[in-house]
From Swiss-Prot:
Molecular functions (GO terms): magnesium ion binding; orotate phosphoribosyltransferase activity
Reactions catalysed according to its record: orotidine 5'-phosphate + diphosphate = orotate + 5-phospho-alpha-D-ribose 1-diphosphate
Protein name (record): Orotate phosphoribosyltransferase 1
Binding site for orotate: T142, R170
Pathway field: Pyrimidine metabolism; UMP biosynthesis via de novo pathway; UMP from orotate: step 1/2
Keyword field: Glycosyltransferase, Magnesium, Pyrimidine biosynthesis, Transferase
């Protein structure tokens, strides 16, 4: 039970966000020459798995995203594999420990070739997204195409998506692209916050 005491309320304040930023800086931010999943060449890179796979990073990221869940009154949270999976897993666990559980799903890039062959994973046999408000999340937003793919799949099965969120926004077009599809992007952190202090 002692571990539970360390989980702060959703409105955890600027201190936790500052701590999260430093974890991202230490574990996930890199300078170099990289080709991003969008095909764009960049001299900065965010590999968010090391942040999301360490306990404190996962907790703090989940708390920031859960603020957005409350703001937009989402009933479900989901995103595209692989980047969103650690995020939504942490959100499910932390929200339950706070007695404010949020249901989560993830969208496969390609349907499984066996079993249920579902594109959307996480729903029970009698559960669907028809008419449900879904917040789409991702670890990093660049062009916004990965987030948009998840949005399209959720909307295809009747989910309502008006908002998306990312842990780090590279500010390279995601906000504008999603706005064209009626979606507001909420960003926890921005790439400029890391470049300016390097």
């Amino acid at each position: 039970m002692a571990a539970l005491a360390k989980f702060r309320p959703v409105d955890s304040g600027q201190h936790d966000k500052d701590e999260l930023r430093e974890i991202v800086r230490e574990r996930s931010f890199r300078f170099g020459r990289y080709t991003l999943s969008s095909g764009i060449e960049s001299d900065i890179y965010f590999n968010m798995k090391p942040t999301m796979m360490v306990a404190r990073g996962a907790q703090l990221a989940a708390l920031e995203f859960l603020k957005i869940v409350e703001q937009v009154k989402a009933e479900y949270v989901g995103g595209l594999e692989m980047g969103a999976v650690p995020v939504i897993g942490s959100m499910a666990a932390v929200s339950s420990m706070m007695n404010k559980p949020i249901n989560t799903i993830f969208v496969r890039k390609v349907p499984k070739a066996h079993g249920t062959r579902d594109v959307i994973e996480g729903l029970g046999p009698k559960e669907d997204l028809e008419g449900k408000v879904v917040l789409i999340v991702d670890d990093v937003a660049t062009s916004g195409k990965s987030i948009l793919k998840a949005i399209e799949e959720v909307r295809r099965v009747g989910g309502i998506v008006g908002d998306a969120a990312c842990l780090v926004d590279r500010d390279e077009g995601a906000t504008a692209l999603l706005a064209q599809h009626g979606v507001t992007l909420h960003s926890v952190l921005h790439a400029s916050e890391f470049v300016e202090r390097h």
